[in-house]
Amino acid sequence: MSGLKKYVMTYEGIKKLENELEYLKTVKRKEITEKIKVALSFGDLSENSEYDSAKNEQAFVEGRIVQLENMLKNASMVDEDEVPLDIVGIGSIVKVKDYDLDEEVEYLIVGSAEADPINNKISNESPVGKGLVGKKPGDVIEIQVPDGVSKYKILNIRR
């Protein structure tokens, strides 16, 4: 049992996965079943690209459903009321001075299952997330990233 991965997530992250799971089970499954029925009506399956496409989509969706169910079953929710304001952790919104970009950036530190770098939700397991966790306002840190070393100063922490 020790091989099971625990997914540390915020309430928002768990809700997002639950909503995706519900959509896949109630809407997407029905759509795919209908596509398969239509494709079967075309007859010969040996040269039926619609059927092959629908079956591939079905396999992908069923795989994603299993993945989401596993993630939710092994999710551990961060109590956002217990997120400290003096040290960076999962659930913290951290404002940093990025010396490379010469600008201030805000990151929400999340578990790996809900990371979304485009929206500044970075995983506690990513290089930057790992470098920020445990630090305090005023700390200046250098973090090894894939294209070198980035330097940040933690300006403030909120939730």
UniProtKB/Swiss-Prot annotation:
It comes from the Bacteria. Pfam families: GreA_GreB, GreA_GreB_N. One of its GO terms (molecular function) is DNA binding. Keywords: Coiled coil, DNA-binding, Transcription, Transcription regulation. Transmembrane segments: none annotated. GO terms for biological process: DNA-templated transcription elongation; regulation of DNA-templated transcription elongation. The keyword Coiled coil applies. Residues 14-76 form a coiled coil. Necessary for efficient RNA polymerase transcription elongation past template-encoded arresting sites. The arresting sites in DNA have the property of trapping a certain fraction of elongating RNA polymerases that pass through, resulting in locked ternary complexes. Cleavage of the nascent transcript by cleavage factors such as GreA or GreB allows the resumption of elongation from the new 3'terminus. GreA releases sequences of 2 to 3 nucleotides. Belongs to the GreA/GreB family. This is Transcription elongation factor GreA. It comes from Clostridium kluyveri (strain ATCC 8527 / DSM 555 / NBRC 12016 / NCIMB 10680 / K1).
